[in-house]
């Protein structure tokens, strides 16, 4: 149904597109149109809070119209791509929503990315504009973007706040340089295809080179509205997602659903415990979440200096729900999601064992799931672990410019292979899903395959441990043995291998799964999209083993 396909993009098969259209999932509305309509419905309500300021929906709508019109003045056109290096500041929303309205495609890079990432992604996506945060602490993104232009190939650099470099456009000047009425007319004159690309998200992966995920206007809109319906987002919702707003979780899990329903989005550049907790208290946040390091630090701070968190109705995390409820005193729910599409949450009425240990059910009745026996397309038996495969109205049909990888990334009948190992359990007539681990994240100890995720879950319960990464270290007898890298809670000492084994024994974990080496770090190395790089951890322990071997034989 797409009018002008973008080369390198895999679009939904015609039959699937027609089916999702008939079901009312995929329609003819773009993200920009939907955001403008929400602004008209909620014009005088607060849309955005950040940087000591507040913006109503009317104000945010006018600003993003002007950004869109300014991009058109610079010579950009729908489907041109924009590298996005703006952190969690209000200007991120000005730029991203302005791109949506102009039909320009944000490439969801991070402010922390440097030449290796941007120097690859900008030419790969053929980006024409590079948005940067000009006042970023400790690094001059304006100078970086200007210096990289010969390699990146972008025509324009646009900066928010801070010092300007020659040839760099100031976002604020672009906004001020165009009349609001003229901007609205320019946006309305565009014919943006809702079936075409709205945003390029980035995959995680283990190769170090992110894969590019095309998400379409109508699929991203449906995804966001489905989350809003599932979670219960309304005009009274006050959302605060402290992690990167540019990530898929921030966009479709929190901020877009809230802005489409007329609620308030809070944004802070810092994510230290006091900022996190005080923002919740001051803004009466109802919907928030975080990852384990954020949660652990918040718990420590809350114990020392309690904040009023009574407004929170939903705290979303990938796991640790019982700990969050116990130590922060707020209702906690689990999420599973991926930039490639499918999203699952637990909900208030789910059975206690689901909320404590599982990730819930998919948000759309049109989501199709198959747990396949790893390496095959064959369904696993109910209750048996299998690779999580899915398709649906908002799930990827193929990575951008990656035909060879796409051959491996999908089943023969077109279901996306996530690489995640899951288990389905039927409770009360409904299937609920539990995340078991990554298929490629197993440790092969002799004849036994050990889930690194399982080891991490149990080790993570030790009181000294803030975060854990389990890997297989090379071993001449077993092939691999279990090694864990730990980040410790403040003031805690690392357990010895024997002490950790005794602790795991009290939890009933089989002895062959116990770690046989412990390493302690302050921070884990990460891939270019912020996930723990287990490849680098394996390299680290392998090098240490080699040095130890040489020391014994030298």
Provide a role label for each language-model segment:
Residues 53-55, 67-118, 123, 244, ...:
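Conserved AMP-binding/adenylate-forming
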Residues 84, 113-123, 130-134, 392, ...:
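AMP-binding/adenylate-forming catalytic core of the ANL superfamily
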Residues 103, 221-238, 246-287, 301:
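Conserved AMP-binding/adenylation subdomain of ANL enzymes
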Residues 346, 362-366, 376-409, 448-450:
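Conserved ATP/PPi-binding loop(s) of AMP-dependent carboxylate-activating enzymes
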Residues 56-58, 198-222:
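Conserved AMP-binding A3 loop
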Residues 160, 509-531, 550-554:
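AMP-binding/adenylate-forming catalytic domain of the ANL superfamily
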Residues 1, 73-74, 104-173, 297-306, ...:
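Structural core segment of the AMP-binding/adenylate-forming
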Residues 176, 282-290, 299-357, 364-368, ...:
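Gly/Ser/Thr-rich phosphate-binding loop
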């Amino acid at each position: 149904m797409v009018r002008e396909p973008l080369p390198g993009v895999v679009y939904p098969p015609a039959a699937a597109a027609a089916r999702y259209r008939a079901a009312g999932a995929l329609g003819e509305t773009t993200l920009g149109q939907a955001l403008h309509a929400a602004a008209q419905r909620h014009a005088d309500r607060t849309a955005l809070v950040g940087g000591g300021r507040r913006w109503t929906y009317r104000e945010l709508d006018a600003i993003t119209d002007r950004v869109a019109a300014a991009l058109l003045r610079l010579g950009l056109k729908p489907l041109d791509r924009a590298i996005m290096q703006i952190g969690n500041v209000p200007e991120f929303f000005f730029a991203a929503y302005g791109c949506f309205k102009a039909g320009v495609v944000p490439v969801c890079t991070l402010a922390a990315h440097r030449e290796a990432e941007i120097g690859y992604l900008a030419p790969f996506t053929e980006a024409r504009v590079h948005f940067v945060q000009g006042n970023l602490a400790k690094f001059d993104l304006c100078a970086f973007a200007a210096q990289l232009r010969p390699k990146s190939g972008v025509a324009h650099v646009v900066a928010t706040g801070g010092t300007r470099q020659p040839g760099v456009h100031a976002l604020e000047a672009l906004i001020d340089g165009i009349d609001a009425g003229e901007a609205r007319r320019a946006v309305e004159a565009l014919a943006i295809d809702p079936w075409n690309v709205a945003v390029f998200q980035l995959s995680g992966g283990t190769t170090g080179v992110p894969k590019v995920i095309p998400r379409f206007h109508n699929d991203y809109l449906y995804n966001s509205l489905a989350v809003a319906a599932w979670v219960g987002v309304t005009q009274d919702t006050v959302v605060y997602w402290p992690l990167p707003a540019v990530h898929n979780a921030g966009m479709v899990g929190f901020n877009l659903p809230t802005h489409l329903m007329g609620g308030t989005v809070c944004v802070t550049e810092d994510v230290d415990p006091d900022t996190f907790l005080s923002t919740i208290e001051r803004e009466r946040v109802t919907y928030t979440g975080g990852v384990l390091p954020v949660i652990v630090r918040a718990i420590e701070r809350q114990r020392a200096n309690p904040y009023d968190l009574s407004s929170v109705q939903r705290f979303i995390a990938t796991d640790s729900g019982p700990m969050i409820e116990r130590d922060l005193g707020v209702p906690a729910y689990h999420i599973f999601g991926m930039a490639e599409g499918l999203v699952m949450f637990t909900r208030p009425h789910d059975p206690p064992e689901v909320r404590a240990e599982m990730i819930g059910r998919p948000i759309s009745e049109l989501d199709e799931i198959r747990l396949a026996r790893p390496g095959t397309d064959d369904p696993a038996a109910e209750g048996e672990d299998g690779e999580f495969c899915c398709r649906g109205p908002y799930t990827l049909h193929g990575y951008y410019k990656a035909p060879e990888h796409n051959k491996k990334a999908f089943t023969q009948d077109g279901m996306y292979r996530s690489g995640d190992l899951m288990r389905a359990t039927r409770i009360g007539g409904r299937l609920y899903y539990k995340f078991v681990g990554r298929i490629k994240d197993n440790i092969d100890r002799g004849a036994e395959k050990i889930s690194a995720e399982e080891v991490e879950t149990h080790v993570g319960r030790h009181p000294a441990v803030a975060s854990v990464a389990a890997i297989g270290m090379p071993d001449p007898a077993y092939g691999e043995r279990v090694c864990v890298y730990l980040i410790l809670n403040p003031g805690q000492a690392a357990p010895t291998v024997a002490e950790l084994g005794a602790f795991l024994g009290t939890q009933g974990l089989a002895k062959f799964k116990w770690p046989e080496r412990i390493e302690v770090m302050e921070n884990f190395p990460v891939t270019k999209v912020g996930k723990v790089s287990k490849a680098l951890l394996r390299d680290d322990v392998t090098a240490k083993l080699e040095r130890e071997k040489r020391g014994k034989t030298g």
